[in-house]
C-alpha cells in the first residue's frame, strides 16, 4: 500500500485530462503580446501540470525578462502529441532535466523532435520516498517540513556545481530553454530562483514566482491527498503530506539564507558558489533581458 502511495506522489499524475487541448488555443507568448501577462503564465498542457513561462518579470534596474525564452516545468513523461507540438511551436531548443537516474528510468521524458535533452541529476529522490513512507506511518507535519528545509540547504551546499553548470548551459546558445524536475517545485524552483536573481529580479518577486506552484497545482494536491486517504482506507492522515506536495516560503528563504550566510549575498553565491563570471552574467542578461 505504501508503495502505491509513493508511486502516486512521484508520478504526480493520478488522472490525465480527458480531452486534448486544441493546439490552436495555446498561447505563443513570444510573438503575441495579448498573452504577455500573468493570466497566461501557466501553459495549457495535457500531460503536465506546472509548466510555466518566466517572461515578464521586472528587474530592479527597470528591464524585463523576455517572453518566450525561459520555461520551468514538472516532468514531461506524460505529455501528449499536441503538447509536443506546442513545445516545438514555442521554439524551445533544449530541455534540462534535474531528476535522478531512478526517476528518469521510472518516468522517462518524452522529448519532442528537434529539442535537445540535457541531464543534470540532483538526487533527492531516494530520501524523499523514504520520508513519504515514514509520514504515512505517523510522522508529524513538522518533520515533513524539515525534510524540504534541509533539501534547500543542500541545493546551496551540495549541488552548487550542478546549478552553476545549469546557468552556463542557458547561455551556450540563443534558443529558448525549459528546465524541470518531477513536480517542478523544489529542484526546478531553486533553479528558477537563482536564474531570476542573476538576471536582477528582486528577491520578493522571485519568492512570488516560487509560491505560484501552490496556486497552479492546488486542485491536484487536493486530489492526491484524497486518493492517498482512500487507498489507505482513511487510516492515514494524508494532510501531513501537504508540505511535501506544495511549497512554502520558508523553503526558498532557507536556501537564500544559507547562501547569504556562506557567501555574504546571493550575487556573491552566484559568482563564487556557482562560479559564474561577470562575462557569464552579461551573456545571461543579454539573452534573457
Task: Show the residue positions of the predicted features.
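General helical secondary-structure elements
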Residues: 1-2, 22
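Cys-dependent protein tyrosine phosphatase-like superfamily
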Residues: 17-177, 191-289
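Ser/Thr-glycine-rich phosphate-binding loops at phosphate-binding pockets of nucleotides
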Residues: 183, 187-188
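Hydrophobic h-region of N-terminal signal peptides that target proteins for export
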Residues: 10-18
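Generic cytosolic/nucleocytoplasmic N-terminal low-complexity/intrinsically disordered segments
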Residues: 2-3, 15
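Sec-dependent signal peptide recognition
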Residues: 3-9
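Catalytic nucleophile loop of clan PA
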Residues: 180
